[in-house]
Amino acid sequence: MRRGVRHAKKESSPVRYKEQLTAFVRHLRRGCQALLLCAVAQAAQAAGGSLAGDIGASLQEEGLSGAVWSEVRDDGAISTGAAGLANAASKAAMRADTKVQVGSVAKVGLALGVLRLATENRLALDTPLAQILPDLKLKNAWQGSDPVRIRHLLDHTSGLDNVRFWQAFSSKAAAGTPLADAFDGGGGLLRVRDRPGSRYAYSNMGYGILGMVIEKVTGQPYERYLDAQVLAPLGMKDSTFGFVTQTGAKPDARLAMGHFEHGVTHAAMPMYLRPAGQLTTTAQDMARLAQFLLGDGKAQGSAFITPALMRMLSRPNGTEASQAGLDAGHGLALAVRDRHNVVGECHPGTTAGFRAMLCIYPEQKSAFFIGFNTDAEHADYERFNRLLMRDLELPLRPPAAHGAPAPTVENFQGVYVPAPSPMASMAWLDAVFGFVRVKWDGDSLFLIPFQGEPKELEPVGGFLFRASDRSAPSHVLLQTDGRHVLSDGLHSYERVSMLRMLVLWGSLALGVIGLLYVLVVGLWRAAGRNLPRNDHLFAPLLSLLALLLPLPFFYFQSFMRLGDVTFASVLAALVTGALPLAVAVGLARCWRTRGTGAVEKLDAIPLLAALQLLLVLAWWGLLPLRLWQL
C-alpha cells in the first residue's frame, strides 16, 4: 500500500480496493492486448492478399509513385518485388532491379567501412578524432576529459549539430566537392553541445566527418574505398557510393526518378554531406547487405568484421540512457526499433525525392528493405513496414511486465524541452513549441506534448517505462549533474523551470500581439488616410509588409537552393533585419512625442512588446533570417 495509513482490516481499506482494482484493470488490459495480437496475426494470415498487391494499393492510397523491396527469410532465401512507377512523367514501371537512392541508409554502409578499418587495425574506435584530423577544429568544452572519438561519430553521441540549411539545400555542391568544404561555415559550426559519449543526438555532420576519416586513413576518396572494400566483398555489384543521377552527361537509365507530392519529379543532385546520405542501390543488393548484418561478420567465407564489433551494431554503449537500464537506442550502425510488437534493428533514410527503410531481425534471421522514389511529407510510410513484417510472419512479442515504479518518480514531473535540439539553429523554436509536460498520476506516467497526442507510459520497474504502443521498455527517467532528464534512447529532454517557460511564452504572446496591433491598426489608419510618414506606426507597418517581398522569389526558386546566397535569401535577410530597426524608430517617435496625447502611449506599449520579441529572436540567432547560416 503506497499511500495512507495501514488499516487493521485490509478488506475495509478503500485504498486497498483501489490498488486491487488498478491491478485487475492492468492485467485485463495486458490480456486484451495479447488477444488482440493473436487476432491481428490470424486476420493478417487469413487476408491472403499478395504482398505486391497490398503494396501497390497502398502506394496509390498514399499518393506515392513507386517502391522496390526485398525480404530475407530465416532460411537465407531472398525475394524481391516492385510496384508503381519509376517515373511518373514517362509512366515507366518500377522493376525489381530498378535502382533507388536510400538517403541515410548509406550510413550503415559507411559504418561498416569504418569497422572494416578497425578490424584491420588501421584505426581504433577509441582514437580521438583530433589525432586523425588535427586541422578540423571542434569547440569541445570537455576536450581534456572527453574528446570526440571515432565511436562517438558512429553512434551519434559526439554532441555535434545535425545539419545546417546550406549543407542540405544547396546547388553549389558538386560530385567531387572536397568533404572539408561542408565544414567551412564559421566557428560555431562544430560546437560540441553535450559531453561526448553521454547522449544520442543524430548528426549528419558526424558522418560527413567519418568520410574524411576514411579518406585520411586510406589515402583515397571514401566513395572509391567503400565501393571496393565494402560493396564488392558483400556482393553488392549494382550499388555505389559515388554520385549517380537520372539526367546530365552520364545518366543512369536504371535509376528511378525522385518525386515529391503530386508526382512532381526531381533529379538527384550532389550534396555537401554526401557520406551521410549518398548511396544508389537495388533491392537485391540491400538484401545482401541485410544477410551480412544478420551474420557473424564473415564475407565470402572470410572474416570481414570481428564478431565483437558485429555485436555492437545496434547496442547503445555508455550513454546516460543505456547506463540507466534502457536498451533502446543506437549502436555503431543501427537503432533498436520496437514497432507492432516486434523488436528489430533498423535504419531509415530520406533524401530529395526518395525514402527508404532497412530492418533486420537477428533472432528470427529475417530482414526487409523497402525503397520509395517519393518523398511525401504526409504519407504513412509505416504501413509498408507493417505489410513487410506481416509477410515475414515475425513472431509477436508480449508487452514487458508491469513493475513497481521508483518511489521518487513524482519528483520528475514538470516541463521538458529537447536537449539538445535536433538542429542548434532551431533551439528557440524547439523550446517554445517542442516542449513536453511530464505528469505522474500514481499509476502511469503521461507525456503531454504541445503538438501531438498525449502518450501514456506504464512503469516496468524503477525509472523504466513502456509506451502503450511498444513491447519493450521505451523510456527512462534519470538525473545527471543535477538535471532531470527524460530519454527514449534516441531523444532526450531536460526539465526546465516553469518561470523560464512562462517568460518564453509570455515574450512570444506579447510580441505577436504587438505585431498584430501594428498590422491591424496601421492598415486601419492607412485606409482612413490617417498614416503620415511621421506616424509612430508608419515605419513598423511598412517594414512588416516588406516581409512579403521575398515570397514570390522563393516561390520561383528551387527549394534545393534554400541554403544558397540568392536574391530571395538576401532580400529575406534585409527585410527581417530591418523589422526591429523600424519598430525601434516607431518607438523613438513615441518617446519624442510623449505627453502630447493618449495615442502615443497606446502605440508605445505594443511597439515595445513587438521589439522585445524581435530582440529575443535576434539573441537566438533567428534575426536577421540568414538561411545560408542556419
Features from the language model and the residues they span:
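Bacterial N-terminal signal peptides that target proteins for export
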Residues: Y17-C32
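N-terminal signal peptide c-region/cleavage motif recognized by signal peptidases
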Residues: C38-A44
